[in-house]
Amino acid sequence: MSVVVGDRSESTLMRSDYKAPPSQAIPKARLQVWFFRVCSCILVWTCLIQLFWHSQIFTGLTNHISRFSLPVQSVPLPPPLPPRNYTSNGILLVSCNGGLNQMRAAICDMVTVARLLNLTLVVPELDKKSFWADTSDFEDIFDIKHFIDSLRDEVRIIRRLPKRYSKKYGFKLFEMPPVSWSNDKYYLQQVLPRFSKRKVIHFVRSDTRLANNGLSLDLQRLRCRVNFQGLRFTPRIEALGSKLVRILQQRGSFVALHLRYEMDMLAFSGCTHGCTDEEAEELKKMRYAYPWWREKEIVSEERRVQGLCPLTPEEAVLVLKALGFQKDTQIYIAAGEIFGGAKRLALLKESFPRIVKKEMLLDPTELQQFQNHSSQMAALDFIVSVASNTFIPTYYGNMAKVVEGHRRYLGFKKTILLDRKRLVELLDLHNNKTLSWDQFAVAVKDAHQGRRMGEPTHRKVISVRPKEEDYFYANPQECIS
């Protein structure tokens, strides 16, 4: 290619018959040639860079930079699975009851029932009438879009009941509470035929309405899929929960202590050990104030020796020490307001100075949006408890069971399930000086070897008394490899 210099080409300049101008003009002509050569090279390289910028070069550069940037989910999400093609037999409307984790398990069960019966499921309504009086809707706690999309290949889920089926338009819903601990035959033989006469059925209760055992492997694994994949907290809750975990982990390993010594638990169970007479009377009045709490007259000490009461904060101190936890152990209290306030936590703080709660780790403005929303607060505790190095519940309630199962699913993370019946016996023997401290500590450790550390094990099955069986969500063995 010739490069033009004025009216001459480079080839003309190189001809042997060409008479050069006076010597003083030669350096200027050569400078012009080299100038245009350099410009041409720059132009070519610029074009090449533009061509490859968004492919190899750019990709390599951004990959290199990303190593030093904050962890961000850069992997694209897989496309949503295609919806399952089925003719719906009707619409299932569900009202959940109880606290966050009781409702969580119930949602998993109701998705499974909808799949079994080929129903369209309306996003479940959360409990707003119980003791906690939390006004949160499903989408305030869980990522509703993810819930619907992630399960679309199994169940058709809609956000709300179509208007034509609402009371406002004169439609009368058929309401029923399913029988507790029911198997697939109950739903196929007793519930499904009702949809031939009614387009919509409303389940007014949802707690423990599906059996722990005896279901097909596909149904059991669907329960797990909803629990571990379909039910994801909102980005706001996930972000703050992750921040709590990050703060705790930066300070070292930590124990999540689910100290279930809260007013609702004590009033419901009738457990008043360690309370004053005035506090015991306050708890009794509260129990009578809630008509759906069936038991009213409860003898606290009888309940306690049967292992049916949560440990008091003072009892928890002795048990933690006996299990070998040192004074410098970082302990996160996964609980709401402790009954009796700061005075009941005094011994715990004295024995383990590194006691923390979410209110101590976060700025008040960060928690302000969660105030008066106990289920959203419980979601934060759930995230921290699942992530903890060791999880210890002082009462084996719904949160303890669901967190235990989640930790098993994540690789059998250490979970100490306290044998409260045995512990009460040992605590009383130690407190009345029958057992020395060393004897007490050895006995406590011996009582928690084997099945009580979250190791792999099979669920205990008692078909005639399903309430006494091991809970499916505490040990979803069908889903753990």
Curated annotation (Swiss-Prot):
- Recorded catalytic activity of this chain's protein: alpha-D-galacturonosyl-[(1->2)-alpha-L-rhamnosyl-(1->4)-alpha-D-galacturonosyl](n) + UDP-beta-L-rhamnose = [(1->2)-alpha-L-rhamnosyl-(1->4)-alpha-D-galacturonosyl](n+1) + UDP + H(+)
Question: Any idea which GO molecular function terms this record carries?
Answer: glycosyltransferase activity
Q: Say which domain of life the source belongs to.
A: Eukaryota
Which InterPro entries does the record match to this protein? FucosylTrfase_pln (IPR024709), GDP-Fuc_O-FucTrfase (IPR019378)
Question: What EC number(s) are associated with this protein in UniProt?
Answer: 2.4.1.351
Q: Which CDD domains match?
A: O-FucT_plant
This protein's pathway: Glycan metabolism; pectin biosynthesis
Name its cellular compartments: Golgi apparatus membrane
The UniProt keyword set, sorted, is: Carbohydrate metabolism, Cell wall biogenesis/degradation, Fucose metabolism, Glycoprotein, Glycosyltransferase, Golgi apparatus, Membrane, Signal-anchor, Transferase, Transmembrane, Transmembrane helix
Q: Where does substrate bind?
A: 258-260
Q: Where are the transmembrane segments?
A: 33-55
Main site of residence?
Answer: Golgi
Gene Ontology CC: chloroplast; Golgi membrane
Q: Which residues are glycosylated?
A: 85, 118, 372, 432
- Membrane topology, record value: Single-pass type II membrane protein
What is any one GO biological process for this UniProt entry? Answer: fucose metabolic process
Q: Record's Pfam families?
A: O-FucT
Function, in words: Glycosyltransferase involved in the formation of rhamnogalacturonan I (RG-I) oligosaccharides in the seed coat mucilage, which is a specialized cell wall with abundant RG-I. Transfers the rhamnose residue from UDP-beta-L-rhamnose to RG-I oligosaccharides.
Q: Which family does it belong to?
A: Belongs to the glycosyltransferase GT106 family.
State the protein's name: Rhamnogalacturonan I rhamnosyltransferase 4
Write down the species.
Answer: Arabidopsis thaliana
